[in-house]
Amino acid sequence: MIIGFGNDLCDIRRIEESLARFGERFIARCFTDIERRKSEGRPSRAASYAKRFAAKEACAKALGTGLTQGVFWRDMGVVNLPSGKPTLALTGGAAERLALLTPPGLTAIIHLTLTDEFPLAQAQVIIEAVASEASFRPMT
């Protein structure tokens, strides 16, 4: 069952301007250490940060809070599964909100897609609640 959906477009030029104007202060305020390492190693640094920024905005929308109610930028971090597929790791207020959204006996899975084509970066987040292994009972 889908319990949340969010979409966001981010202008890469806006992120370039923020990086130039605020530098480390902007990066430290918005991005996790994992995101920073990933983005700093990319040839298109601003596009990488813009995709992650869009992912956070989309996630906040999917959670139904925006960046309010105790949900902060660094509570949402883009990470990659072993397959390479991107997803979001939630901590703090974002994790608490996700727990409130997830029906008892179900487990939340966050699906994330990222893309960019200068000057835009886009992210879509779908939060799905699925039967957890503990609540799964095979039919006999």
UniProtKB/Swiss-Prot annotation:
SUPFAM superfamilies: 4'-phosphopantetheinyl transferase. The keyword Cytoplasm applies. GO terms for molecular function: holo-[acyl-carrier-protein] synthase activity; magnesium ion binding. Keywords: Cytoplasm, Fatty acid biosynthesis, Fatty acid metabolism, Lipid biosynthesis, Lipid metabolism, Magnesium, Metal-binding, Transferase. Its cofactor is Mg(2+). Its main location: cytoplasm. One of its GO terms (cellular component) is cytoplasm. GO terms for biological process: fatty acid biosynthetic process. InterPro entries: 4-PPantetheinyl_Trfase_dom (IPR008278), 4-PPantetheinyl_Trfase_dom_sf (IPR037143), ACPS (IPR002582), Ppantetheine-prot_Trfase_dom (IPR004568). Mg(2+) binds at D8, E57. HAMAP family: AcpS (MF_00101). Transfers the 4'-phosphopantetheine moiety from coenzyme A to a Ser of acyl-carrier-protein. Belongs to the P-Pant transferase superfamily. AcpS family. This is Holo-[acyl-carrier-protein] synthase.
